[in-house]
Amino acid sequence: MTLFIAGVTLEEVREATVSALFVKLEQEKKALYLGAGSEDSLNLCKSTLDKVQEDYPLDDMEKDYLRDLLQFWLSRLFLGDGFEGEIPDSSEDLRRTATTAFTYTAAIRHYCM
């Protein structure tokens, strides 16, 4: 099994990336249904998700799209509504937050660079 940073495996990176893309795909579908989205954005999300699931290389546009999405998710870890600049209450919460941050960082490195 390939290890990335802090013990995050390639499979964990792929699972987190697919999960983030699936959430975004659902958002894109809803936006398009409500008239606020675009077919191009939906198709870009779909093609990126398909390639990540099949472990195919991404083109430059897909890399940029995925990088922006993962950077957004990474920033929400620390700048989201529930985060107030405080250290998490428990070591388990801190460990979970750090692992998630390492996973998104590893995904950016693996898929987008």
From Swiss-Prot:
It comes from the Viruses. This is Putative gene 57 protein. It comes from Bacillus phage SP01 (Bacteriophage SP01). The gene is 57.
